[in-house]
């Protein structure tokens, strides 16, 4: 009898856990009943936590608390798209976040702007600019016509040939170059060139010296600079050797090409004008000094009108197709109507 009771006790001891838990929970587990609500919450928390956090909690080394704090900081900073590294201060992080948010907000504002409105605004601005430019161009053309009419009424006998025609007409007057180089003829342009060379501290004409020159003092008046340079090129090709061998400090300072363009070319044109206008009663050009004064008084006309007219004869037809009659043709028609 006693042996039977001992066997029953041993069987019950096997069913009861040795951890010392209370009888209620043990009996529930034995009978297959659900556990308490506290136990269910614990199971839910474990299943919802990150795997790394679970491993840290089960770490027997006791470092789970500090590592969990670092993980929480990293997760928080990941939400702000900032990765902390060792040695970075909190104020720097906050400032970086502030700048990032400002840039992001600005980009969002740009993206939300109506692009079609921007395009319309640009078209409107471009149209206004084009209209203003066209008005300015018309005003400039009108001003040029007024200047040309005044010049033609004052100097009706002065003709401005195209460059190819002019380069043929000046050939008989190239001999004046020998007279200027030898000192037989006094040249106003040579005197000005000499003064420019003496005022310079350089042995040769430098870019700075050239920028400081008043180029109007070396321009053949109403002929304009473009035609003058064409004449200068012919002079240089014909007198290249003489200019290169010259011992004159002034010619050496200017150099053969610039001396031909800005000293000799105006003098050749002076001879051309003096010869073609001497026999015309309407103009009193009896000396080179008279032509010098004419050139000085008509430099503005050459720069603003002549240099904007076709240089070659073939340019005239192209300009006529694009813009209509040139200023020369308009002036001729105006004079014809008045007569």
UniProtKB/Swiss-Prot annotation:
Biased composition (Polar residues): 45-66
Subcellular location, record wording: Cytoplasm; Nucleus
Domain of life of the native organism: Eukaryota
Region (Disordered): 1-80, 312-339
Comp. bias (Basic and acidic residues): 1-12, 67-80
InterPro entries named among the record's database cross-references: RTC4, RTC4_C
Family matches, as Pfam families: RTC4
Keywords from the UniProt entry: Cytoplasm, Nucleus
Gene Ontology CC, one term: cytoplasm
Basic residues bias spans: 330-339
Principal localisation: cytoplasm
Role played: May be involved in a process influencing telomere capping.
Similarity comment: Belongs to the RTC4 family.
Protein name stated in the entry: Restriction of telomere capping protein 4
Gene name per UniProt: RTC4
